[in-house]
C-alpha cells in the first residue's frame, strides 16, 4: 500500500478551564487515574500515618482520544477505571506482585466468571508499558469476549511499576524527599515500588 506522510496524533483530550479559550487556561482530560494517587502520595502518608506496605484505591473516569474506538464498551473514548496503587519495599515487590496477581484473578472468578472464559497471560517484552521493567512482572487478566480477536481481551492488568512514577514526580517537581518513604525503624528514606492492579469497570460489566 501507499504510505502517507507522518502525522502527529493527539491521544489526550484538550480543553480550557473557564469560559474563554485562553491558551494560559489549557487543560487536558486525564488519560489514566493513577497519577493523582502518586501526586498525593505524601499527603496520604502525612494524614493517615500509614506504614509500608499499604495501598491507595480509587475508581473514576479516564479519557483517551482513541483513533479507532470499537467493540461496544471494550474500546471507547470515555471509560471507568478501578485501580489500586500498592506501595511496597523494593525487596518485597516480587512477592507482592505474585500475591496481587493471584488475588485479582480469583476476584473475577468470585463474581461468577467461568475459568473457561478467563485466562492470565504474562505480557511479552514488546507489550511492556514505559513504566514496566523487563522481568519485574506485568500480566493481563483476559476474558473471552465475542468480539475480540483471537478471542480474549484484557479485563485487568497487574503491573510492577517499580519506582518509576514516584521518581518522575520527584525529579520534575524538585521535591525529591517528598516522594520518598521514611522508614523509622531503619532510619532511611527510599522510593517505594508499586504494584498496580488496574481494571476496566465498563469491560467487567
Regions found by a protein language model. Give the residues of each.
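TRNA-recognition modules of translation machinery and tRNA-sensing kinases, especially anticodon-binding
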Residues: 1-205
Amino acid at each position: 500500500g501507499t504510505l502517507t506522510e507522518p502525522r502527529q496524533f493527539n491521544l489526550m483530550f484538550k480543553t480550557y478551564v473557564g469560559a474563554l479559550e485562553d491558551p494560559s487556561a489549557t487543560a487536558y482530560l486525564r488519560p489514566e487515574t493513577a497519577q493523582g494517587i502518586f501526586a498525593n502520595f505524601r499527603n496520604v502518608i502525612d494524614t493517615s500515618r500509614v506504614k509500608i506496605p499499604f495501598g491507595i484505591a480509587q475508581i473514576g473516569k479516564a479519557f483517551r482520544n482513541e483513533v479507532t474506538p470499537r467493540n461496544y464498551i471494550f474500546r471507547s473514548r470515555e471509560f471507568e477505571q478501578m485501580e489500586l496503587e500498592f506501595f511496597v519495599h523494593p525487596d518485597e515487590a516480587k512477592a507482592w506482585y505474585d500475591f496481587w496477581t493471584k488475588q485479582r484473578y480469583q476476584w473475577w472468578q468470585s463474581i461468577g466468571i467461568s475459568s473457561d472464559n478467563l485466562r492470565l497471560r504474562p505480557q511479552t517484552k514488546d507489550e511492556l508499558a514505559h513504566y514496566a521493567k523487563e522481568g519485574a512482572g506485568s500480566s493481563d487478566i483476559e476474558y473471552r469476549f465475542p468480539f475480540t480477536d483471537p478471542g480474549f481481551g484484557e479485563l485487568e492488568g497487574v503491573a510492577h511499576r517499580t519506582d518509576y512514577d514516584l521518581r518522575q514526580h520527584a525529579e520534575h517537581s524538585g521535591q525529591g524527599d517528598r516522594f520518598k518513604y521514611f522508614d523509622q525503624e531503619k532510619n532511611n528514606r527510599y522510593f517505594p515500588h508499586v504494584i498496580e492492579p488496574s481494571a476496566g469497570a465498563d469491560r467487567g460489566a
